Structures are given as C-alpha cells and as structure tokens.
UniProtKB/Swiss-Prot annotation:
GO terms for molecular function: calcium ion binding. InterPro entries: EF-hand-dom_pair, EF_Hand_1_Ca_BS, EF_hand_dom, Parvalbumin. Keywords: Calcium, Metal-binding, Muscle protein, Repeat. In muscle, parvalbumin is thought to be involved in relaxation after contraction. It binds two calcium ions. Ca(2+) 2 binds at D90, D92, D94, K96, E101. This is Parvalbumin alpha.
Length: 109
C-alpha cells in the first residue's frame, strides 16, 4: 500500500490540503507528500500503486482518482484538473502517463 512508500502523516497532510474547493496543484501535492525526496524506486512503487489496472500506464480515469490512490479520504479531481495534469505529464502525447513520464513529473516538481 501507499503507506509502505510514504508515511501516513504526510499522505493525510497532502490529501487535506486539497479538500473540495482547493484547486489541485501537483507540484504542491508532491512536496507535501515528500515524494520528490524519495528514491526513484519509491517513486516507481507509487506509480505502480496508482496504476490500478496494471496496464503500465496511468490513464485519464486513474489520474482523476490520483488522490484516492493515496488515501480513500481523497476527492476525485475535476475534469479540468485531470486534463491539465494529463497534458502536463503526458510528454509523448499518447493520452496516458507511463512510469518514465510520472518519474519526470515528480522530478520537475
């Protein structure tokens, strides 16, 4: 589970920062989680947890549930937040985020 990668207290802090009404900001989310300070192996582990269908990609519907991937308390992203994050992360334009793209997205945060 995600708590094997990131301490639960950090997950809770990050999830609560983006309650309903708070615009989702991936960079801020990554910093609150401390994900940018984790090892590449941990970032890859987080990716695989978010990749619910084990396709090797985070598709748009999985991206919309990214906060829920960290905690069931998390809200769904709005359609606009999801699209914005997809555009930011999808470097090769295939409409989904691969592990290398996810790692880059975290590293750039």
């Amino acid at each position: 589970s995600m708590t094997d990668v990131i301490p639960e207290a950090d997950i809770n802090k990050a999830i609560h920062a983006f309650k309903a009404g708070e615009a989702f900001d991936f960079k801020k989310f990554v910093h609150l989680l401390g994900l940018n300070k984790r090892s590449p192996a941990d970032v890859t582990k987080a990716f695989h947890i978010l990749d619910k269908d084990r396709s090797g990609y985070i598709e748009e519907e999985e991206l919309q549930l990214i906060l829920k991937g960290f905690s069931k308390e998390g809200r769904e992203l709005t359609d606009k937040e999801t699209k914005d994050l997809l555009i930011k992360g999808d470097k090769d334009g295939d409409g989904k985020i691969g592990v290398d793209e996810f790692t880059s997205l975290v590293a750039e945060s």
